[in-house]
């Protein structure tokens, strides 16, 4: 049976846009979504070998669903400018590939896909749907397979579902998936569902009763009781409407002929080569082996004399080796050790442990932190000479991912094939393939480490690498292993307290509205505010009234209901994101949150915190700050919080060599009051609280390249006044003005900027023909040396503090870094010593011509320690 591959293009491009770090051509054209999309497409072509390919796109126009329900997708934010710019380019690339584009006004891509799948089934063609959206699982059958694209550990992976696989995974059939969505709704599409029915309940009901029609015909006889029974009865109308909205239309009026979608491959495709070359997607050009690849490096055969065998660690000699580990969960299943062109596979656990703990052998590894965290002290990896993933990040921090395979392809044009996980037959030697793959990675790692090491030296980044980023790997592993203790009981109480407040606010809103309605529905809220209460609409959308935060802020003084709605939204988000969300990630064994800290994500050098993101714990409201009360020290310990004071302004004073700013910091004066005094021409002692606040906004705004429009908004003044304030500021701070002018010129000339430790950030946006993108590039040029240097300083401090805590044999441990602060869980007998270490190491982390100041506090909870 012939095979057709159809792409849910918007879905895959959207996932790629958010999953791939910002990439752009030299002219500033964003390319990250296209890059990710093409990598997924090429993987699918290789895996599925389709006879036909077509791509479905949404059309920017209302669909029949918008006519059925005005609130459909009303909450969805507009497509980001960077993604919107790539949509037509993606179509150009697909057309050049010979891929047929399918789109129809009034219908969504899913409807086109459903229709094509039906036509394929009728024509005895096997249909494969590639998507990032589970909505398409309703189309799965014995002839139609749904390929869900997912990203795991930096790799694009695919999961294939037919009807049996859907049933096995979710315990409902593909068509029953529609009924599940009818009950639980879908916030991303603003499909309402039944209020109060979540995914778990919806799945359970449909698994038992198979359809909402059956459920509602027998609503009193299927075991529902109490509030759930009432919720279901109240939500009947919404359930049936939601089912209509969630059902893919498989009779979309499109012209489709599979024979017009024949896929012939990419050979000698000059048009495709030219488009990819213009977008500077050179790695895609390499993968496709397109003719005329004059701007791509010649392939180097790094495996020319390659040899490997499975044995023991003594078969590799030398005092420096490469080590690649293969994990099964948190345990090492095998390893490969390389030296030159030779590699040895290790399968014995004792051999691997002995090698890793041998301090006399220097080890070149890749993403060591992950290994340290997984091993969690069972094996102590000693003498880590290099982490090539970190080095590659320093050389080019804008990549979306760092893997040995990708780097080998980029640097040498070498393809390292990753063996399939599945075993096709008993005769397949999967273990041998895996061993050879690991061995090749070990050999490639050695060559990569040498080549990337040369670039580190060329860039003058030795100190940044050897003294900051490489030792930080171990420190971050310690942070992840240590974790932060959470008072789960107190967190539950706080969640309950918020729930009570939300219920009270709900009742107040209903009373003021004169009726009950879905507060979370912008459409219903709009009707209440602008029709029933007759408030003047601030903005209208195609589907109704705008009710976003900006609109509500403007209506705050027009009716008391608005304040209650704003507070309701704030508390609802606080509860769902930070109370319920945090409780879900508390380790049940340690009762701690073990956030993941990553070095290779941000282009500024700042660390990334995920699972959960502890850098986003709210601080602007008292209720938000209360979340920090749930993060506590264990018994017999206290939290010591050390926070750099105005570190970015101090870095600015140093880099700009601004005398006024330098003198203020050296004299320990209030920099914001000094700025107000200088700009307004008044004595320092006469500066008011409001004047200081305005000066503070300017001081920090200047660091981020703030303009008069943004400043005017922040200070609630006219644009003319804001412009005058900025001009007066730059007249007084000559060094800052000169820095701003010189760094922009230098960045335009070189195409990049550097921190004090030579951390590099390339800024292709400066060459964009788009004025707004160029302006963004200038702001990046201004801020990166300051923010990046501040990031380098806090990292240096982390390394020094962690080393001293360990080397001095203290029980106290570094457990968190958030922006400019470090938190140590200190034993009660070591508090003074910990404070001394934090003060000494943080204040001496980097020598500036102004002092680095650290504010310190202690407490049982994170809240108390702030």
Where are these regions (language model features)?
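Conserved RNase H-like, two-metal-ion catalytic cores of nucleic-acid enzymes
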Residues: 4-5, 9, 15-54, 70-71, ...
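Extended two-metal-dependent nuclease catalytic cores across DNA- and RNA-processing enzymes
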Residues: 24-25, 74-253
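Active-site-proximal helix-loop-helix substrate-binding element of RNase H-like nuclease domains
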Residues: 153-181, 300-303, 330-458, 468-472, ...
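Conserved "right-hand" nucleotidyltransferase catalytic core of DNA-directed polymerases
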Residues: 235-347, 426-619, 638, 648, ...
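Function-dense linear segments that define catalytic or interfacial modules
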Residues: 336-343, 367, 395-418, 422-426, ...
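Active-site palm subdomain of RNA-directed nucleic acid polymerases
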Residues: 456-468, 472, 793, 797-818, ...
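Conserved catalytic core of nucleic-acid polymerases
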Residues: 481, 587, 594, 599-602, ...
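C-terminal polymerase-core module
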Residues: 500-507, 511-563, 731-779, 783, ...
């Amino acid at each position: 049976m012939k095979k057709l591959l159809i792409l849910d293009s918007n879905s895959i491009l959207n996932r790629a846009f958010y999953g791939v770090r910002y990439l752009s051509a030299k002219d500033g054209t964003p390319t990250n979504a296209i890059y990710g999309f093409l990598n997924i497409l090429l993987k699918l072509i290789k895996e599925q070998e389709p006879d036909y390919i077509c791509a479905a796109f949404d059309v920017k126009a209302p669909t029949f669903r918008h006519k059925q329900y005005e609130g459909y997708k009303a909450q969805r934010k507009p497509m980001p400018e960077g993604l919107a710019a790539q949509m037509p380019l993606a179509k150009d690339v697909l057309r050049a590939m010979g891929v047929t584009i399918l789109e129809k006004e009034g219908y969504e891509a899913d409807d086109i896909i459903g229709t094509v799948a039906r036509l394929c089934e009728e024509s005895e063609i096997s249909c494969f749907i590639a998507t990032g959206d589970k909505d398409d699982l309703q189309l799965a059958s014995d002839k139609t397979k749904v390929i869900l694209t997912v990203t795991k550990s930096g790799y694009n992976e695919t999961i294939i579902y037919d009807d049996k696989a859907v049933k096995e995974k979710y315990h409902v059939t593909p068509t029953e998936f529609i009924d599940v969505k009818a009950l639980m709704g879908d916030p991303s599409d603003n499909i309402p569902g039944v209020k109060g029915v979540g995914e778990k309940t919806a799945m359970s009901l449909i698994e038992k009763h198979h359809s909402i029609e059956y459920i509602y015909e027998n609503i009193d006889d299927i075991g529902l009781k109490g509030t759930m029974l009432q919720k279901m009865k109240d939500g009947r109308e919404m359930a049936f409407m939601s089912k209509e909205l969630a059902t893919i239309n498989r009779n979309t009026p499109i012209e489709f002929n599979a024979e017009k979608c024949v896929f012939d491959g990419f050979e000698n495709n000059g048009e495709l080569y030219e488009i990819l070359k213009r977008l500077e997607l050179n790695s895609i050009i390499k993968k496709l082996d397109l003719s005329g690849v004059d701007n791509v490096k010649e392939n180097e055969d790094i495996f020319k004399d390659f040899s490997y065998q499975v044995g023991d660690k003594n078969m590799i000699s030398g005092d420096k080796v490469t080590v690649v580990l293969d994990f099964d969960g948190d345990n090492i299943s095998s390893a490969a050790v390389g030296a030159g062109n030779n590699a040895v596979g290790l399968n014995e656990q004792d051999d691997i442990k002995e090698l890793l703990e041998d301090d006399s052998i220097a080890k070149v590894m890749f993403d060591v932190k992950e290994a340290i965290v997984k091993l969690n002290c069972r094996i102590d990896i000693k003498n880590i000479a290099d982490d090539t993933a970190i080095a590659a990040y320093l050389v080019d921090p804008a990549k979306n991912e760092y893997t040995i395979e990708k780097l080998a392809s980029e640097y040498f044009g070498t393809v390292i094939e990753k063996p399939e996980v599945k075993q096709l037959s008993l005769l397949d030697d999967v273990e041998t393939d895996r061993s050879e793959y690991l061995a090749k990675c070990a050999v490639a790692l050695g060559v990569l480490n040498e080549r990337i090491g040369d670039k580190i030296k060329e860039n003058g980044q030795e100190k940044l690498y050897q003294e900051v980023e490489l030792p930080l790997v171990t420190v971050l592993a310690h942070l992840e292993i240590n974790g932060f203790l959470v008072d789960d009981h107190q967190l539950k109480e706080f969640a309950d307290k918020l729930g009570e407040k939300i219920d009270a606010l709900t009742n107040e809103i209903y009373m003021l509205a004169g009726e009950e309605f879905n507060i979370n529905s912008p459409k219903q809220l709009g009707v209440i505010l602008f029709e029933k209460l007759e408030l003047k609409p601030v903005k209208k959308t195609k589907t109704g009234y705008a009710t976003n935060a900006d609109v509500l802020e403007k209506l705050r003084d027009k009716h008391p209901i608005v304040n209650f709605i704003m507070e309701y939204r704030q508390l609802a988000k606080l509860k769902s994101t930070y109370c319920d969300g945090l409780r879900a990630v508390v380790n049940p064994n340690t009762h701690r949150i073990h956030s993941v800290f990553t070095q290779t994500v941000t282009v500024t050098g700042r660390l990334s915190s995920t699972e959960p993101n502890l850098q986003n714990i709210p601080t602007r409201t008292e209720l938000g700050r209360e979340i920090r009360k749930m993060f506590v020290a264990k018994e017999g310990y206290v939290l010591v919080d050390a926070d750099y004071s105005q570190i970015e302004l101090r870095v600015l004073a140093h880099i700009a060599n601004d005398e006024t700013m330098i003198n203020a910091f050296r004299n320990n004066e209030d920099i914001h009051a000094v700025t107000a005094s200088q700009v307004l021409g008044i004595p320092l002692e006469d500066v008011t609280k409001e004047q200081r606040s305005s000066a503070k906004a300017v001081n920090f705004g200047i660091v981020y390249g703030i303009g008069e429009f943004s400043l005017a908004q922040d200070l609630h003044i006219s644009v003319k006044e804001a412009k005058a304030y900025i001009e007066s500021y730059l007249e007084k701070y000559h060094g800052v003005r000169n820095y701003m002018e010189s760094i922009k010129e230098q960045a335009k000339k070189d195409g990049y900027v550097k921190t004090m430790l030579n951390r590099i950030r390339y800024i292709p946006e400066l060459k964009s023909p788009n004025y707004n993108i160029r302006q963004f590039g200038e702001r990046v040029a201004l801020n990166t040396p300051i923010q990046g240097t501040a990031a380098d300083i806090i990292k240096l401090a982390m390394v020094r503090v962690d080393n001293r805590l360990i080397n001095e044999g203290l029980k106290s441990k570094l457990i968190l870094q958030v922006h400019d602060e470090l938190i140590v869980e200190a034993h009660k007998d070591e508090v003074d010593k910990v404070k001394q270490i934090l003060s000494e190491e943080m204040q001496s982390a980097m020598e500036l011509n102004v002092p680095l100041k650290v504010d310190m506090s202690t407490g049982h909870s994170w809240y108390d320690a702030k």
